[in-house]
Each structure stands twice: as C-alpha cells, then as structure tokens.
Amino acid sequence: MTHAVDLVADLGEGFGAYTMGDDEALLDVLTSANIACGFHAGDPRIMDATVRRCAEIGVAVGAHHSFPDLVGFGRRAMDLTPDEVRTDTLYQMGALHAFATAHGTGLRHIAPHGRLGNLVATRPDYAEAVAGAVASFDRSLIVLAQDGELADAARALGLRVGIVGIADRAYRDDGTLVPRSEPGAVLHDAGEIAERTVRMVTEGVIRTVGGRDLPVACDTVLLHGDTPGAIALARRIRGELLTAGVRIAPLTEVLDLKADATVGSA
C-alpha cells in the first residue's frame, strides 16, 4: 500500500503590527492551512491576506478556531458553556468563510486551536458542541482532530474526520499530548522529529514518553511554524517523507485513498 499524508500548519497567527512565523516560506511545504479566525490571533486584514495567498497557490483553507483569548494565545483554560463553544465556533467559521468566498475558494476543514483543541479530545460536551456547529454550518467540512471525543462526535454526525499527527510534540501513553507546561512537551531535535513523523505515517506508531510504541492513525501532519528553525524542519520532514516513499497529497485525497483501501480489503 502506498502511504499518503497531508501537511498542515497554523497560519495567520499575527495581530495588527505583530507577526508570528514565516507563513510565506511555510506555504511552500504545505497542502493545507489552519488559519486563525480572530479569537486567539489573526485580524481581518491578516485573514484576508492569508486566505488570498492560499487560494493563489492551491493550499486548502481551514478554520483554526479557539477560545476568545488573544492575551493568552488561546492556550488558557476558559470556563465556557458548551453552547458558548458552539456559537464561538460558528462565528469563527463564518468569518473565515467570508474571506474564502471573496477569494474564490471555500473552507475545506476545521481545526480547534490550543486549549480548546486539547479539551475537545477529552470532554464529550465540548466535542459535541464543535461537531454540532460544523454539522449545522457545512457538512462537507473535514474535522481535524486527535483520536478522542471530537473525532467520535464528528463521526457520529456523519462528518469526515482527519486524524492529526503532531510532529514536534511528546505523547503520553494514553495518546494525549504532554501539556506545554511540562518539561519535554515540545521536541527540538530535527532528526528525532523527522524520524518520528516518518514512523507515524508509514508504521502507524508514535513513541510515547513512557517508551511505548503507541498505535496512531495519521491523515495529516501538523507542522509548527513558530519555533526556532521551523522552516528548515518543515522542509526536512517533507523531504524525509518523500524519501520514504510517502505521497504528499491534499487531505481529501488522503482520506479517499484510505477509504478505497478499506473497501478493497473488506
């Protein structure tokens, strides 16, 4: 079986005069982009410019929605009700959809950011709120998620799910990410990160902090653009995936290939 994977990164995470990461350089590596929608980062002009550039080069656009937390960059827990999570998700998808429409493209997926992304993996009420918002807005959208509650809630509503493998983050034995507040949560050795990514895609496993080879699905690899050496690392990961015989493809193609393979083996 030929392995295929999508490459995605979080883009448009500046605000006003401030920028974060080198989005233009990173776009050369990607097939998809999670674009900040103004709640943890991003503003109308940044959203407009980022969507326009993605449309120009054929990178799929996704809504990177978050808790309303500009000061904390969406990485702090907030005591929102599930219905607030639902309406905040709808609001942010709608905002990005407007820019996508203006530039002759559309939304392809959604991807919860930061603390919200962590919580929807373990909280059924938040997971159902996000999945319900997506289902009511556009049932063709792919939900990017780790294995967990959001993936389950989205599938229960008949939505397509893309499982995210995070290249530079440490995993616990239960499949959750080591919190950023803990030592070793973010990996920095480029060789180790590239090797882990290739294994994740070709072997379907990730080495945990406990030393286990944890089975994982991986439809898309999340590359971070806001860490030192991020562009060189992203290019190395892409290069080593290609060397390993992995096809880099848009997420819709990756999911279609896996669905066809499942049908063929049934």
Tell me what each language-model feature is.
Residues 10, 64, 110, 223:
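Conserved, mostly hydrophobic/aromatic
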Residues 24-28, 49-62, 101-104:
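Acidic (Asp/Glu)-rich catalytic clusters
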Residues 123-129:
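Charged helix-capping and loop-helix junction motifs
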Residues 259-260:
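Short, low-complexity intrinsically disordered segments enriched in A/P/G/S/L with frequent Arg
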